[in-house]
């Protein structure tokens, strides 16, 4: 039988994702064959992994990192349903790694009934291969208006009960206040058949001495029969990307060196895979700013256009903010401009998407014209995780010459160059990156996560993901009840 540990939260952004990641690493270093699972994730941050049939598919970045923390190979069973928001009320539905246009068009209640059994398939395959499943919930498990369709929290818990011993912990962000009420209310609203799974409350992001909470934890246990399993200290920079595409608007300056480079990453409404830029925040002397206005681009050295889930929509937003003129002026004055995937497509001459595969129906929509590219969108999405090879880029990018780097591609547009030097190729030799003067566009994601690139461009060594996993695992082992942790993990 497979053991399951469920990480529920009282709210979104309570700390479920990073806590599940830390628990995966604790399990791994105790010798437990563990795997992460989230039945449904909503995020435009995705990674390319293997599907059960051997092909390539997408999962949310959180489960990708959790798998790395558990020291297992990520696959689509770990996040069988991924919702990628396209507008305020619509999302692309990705099932076992592949976008399903028919499901994307369905009302969510009808869709959920079809998705739940598909998600369970992933859980059961994982349970057959692993001794422990660390399940991450979504939002709160006590949204009683959603309970009939909630296969992410409640359905997963019932699948876990059927698979073997199961327990749940409930994490709450105490820094926001109201955690005692949140925990009690969530416990009270849980379905009767699942309330008994809850074996511990966890207060996250606490400032100061946990004794200041007394007698709150004791009174909460008296009312619920559930102990407070731990109080985790506030840690702003835990080294992992935030779940759900959340990011901090505050600019950061990498410690250990004086200011030497200002980098602005644009933050349009449909930004995707923003987590790939997190390592820049740790480069000594690099000032990183998420930018939504022209004022935030004043005095920067680099302007980065990131990936986008809706390229034409984000291009329209960029123009509405007057950022197109700022980017053009920056490039004309010799400033560096980098476009990644959708950002690269915006830098080109035109976008052609008459069937609306990327969101809006557009025919030869003018791009920014800084690269001689024409992008045509089609129904087939390119999903690929493989090394890429730089040729001989020049100017600000010359340090990248000859580098072979791990990368991944998630895109439905094909870009063709009229001119400009192809400076990046995939492992088959196909061009996937072009440069014109100081403007560089690449189809590949994940380049800034490569230590080799950070050394080449900045002469910097930043803490690795594995270091972040170990640090978080240390914190969890220090602050969670040791006996409960041993019982939950089985080791």
Positions of predicted regions on the chain:
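A conserved active-site-flanking secondary-structure segment within enzyme catalytic domains
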Residues: 348-403
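Active-site C-terminal subdomain of aminotransferase-like
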Residues: 330-333, 349
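Catalytic nucleophile serine of serine hydrolases
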Residues: 341
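Flexible phosphate-sensing "switch/lid" loops adjacent to ATP/NTP-binding sites
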Residues: 2-329, 336, 379, 394-491
């Amino acid at each position: 039988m497979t053991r399951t540990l469920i990480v529920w939260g009282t709210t979104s952004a309570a700390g479920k994702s990073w806590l599940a990641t830390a628990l995966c690493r604790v399990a791994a270093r105790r010798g437990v064959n563990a795997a992460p699972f989230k039945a449904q994730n909503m995020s435009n941050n995705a990674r390319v992994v293997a599907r059960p049939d051997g092909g390539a598919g997408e999962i949310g970045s959180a489960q990708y990192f959790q798998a790395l923390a558990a020291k297992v190979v990520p696959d689509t069973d770990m996040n069988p349903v991924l919702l990628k928001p396209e507008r305020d009320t619509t999302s692309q539905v990705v099932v076992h790694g592949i976008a399903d246009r028919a499901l994307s068009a369905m009302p969510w209640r009808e869709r959920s009934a079809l998705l739940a059994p598909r998600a369970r398939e992933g859980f059961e395959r994982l349970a057959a291969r692993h001794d422990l499943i660390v399940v991450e919930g979504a939002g709160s498990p006590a949204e009683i208006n959603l309970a009939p369709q909630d296969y992410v929290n409640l359905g997963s818990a019932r699948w876990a009960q059927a698979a073997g011993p199961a327990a749940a912990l409930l994490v709450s962000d105490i820094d926001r206040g109201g955690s005692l009420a949140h925990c009690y209310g969530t416990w009270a609203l849980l379905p009767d058949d699942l309330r008994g799974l809850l074996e511990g409350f966890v207060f996250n992001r606490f400032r100061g001495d946990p004794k200041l909470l007394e007698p709150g934890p004791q009174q909460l246990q008296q009312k619920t029969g559930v102990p407070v399993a731990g109080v985790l200290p506030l840690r702003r920079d835990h080294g992992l990307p935030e779940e759900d595409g959340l990011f901090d608007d505050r600019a950061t300056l990498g410690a250990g060196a004086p200011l030497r480079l200002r980098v602005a990453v644009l933050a349009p409404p449909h930004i995707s895979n923003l987590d790939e830029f997190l390592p820049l925040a740790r480069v000594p002397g690099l000032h990183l700013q998420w930018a939504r206005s022209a004022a935030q681009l004043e005095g920067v050295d680099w302007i980065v256009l990131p990936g986008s889930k809706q390229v034409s929509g984000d291009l329209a937003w960029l123009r509405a903010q007057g950022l197109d003129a700022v980017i053009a002026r920056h490039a004309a004055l010799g400033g560096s401009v980098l476009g990644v995937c959708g950002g690269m497509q915006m830098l080109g001459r035109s976008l052609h998407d008459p069937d609306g595969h990327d969101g809006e129906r557009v025919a030869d929509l003018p791009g920014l014209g800084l690269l001689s590219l024409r992008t045509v969108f089609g129904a087939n999405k390119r999903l690929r995780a493989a090394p890429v090879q730089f040729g001989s880029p020049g100017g600000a990018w010359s340090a990248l010459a000859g580098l072979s780097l791990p990368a991944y591609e998630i895109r439905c547009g094909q870009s063709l160059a009229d001119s400009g030097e192809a400076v990046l190729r995939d492992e088959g030799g196909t061009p996937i990156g072009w440069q014109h003067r100081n403007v560089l566009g690449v189809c590949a994601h994940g380049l800034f996560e490569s230590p080799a690139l950070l050394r080449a461009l900045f002469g910097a060594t930043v803490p690795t993901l594995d270091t972040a996993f170990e640090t978080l695992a240390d914190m969890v082992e220090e602050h969670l009840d040791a006996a409960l942790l041993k019982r939950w993990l089985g080791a």
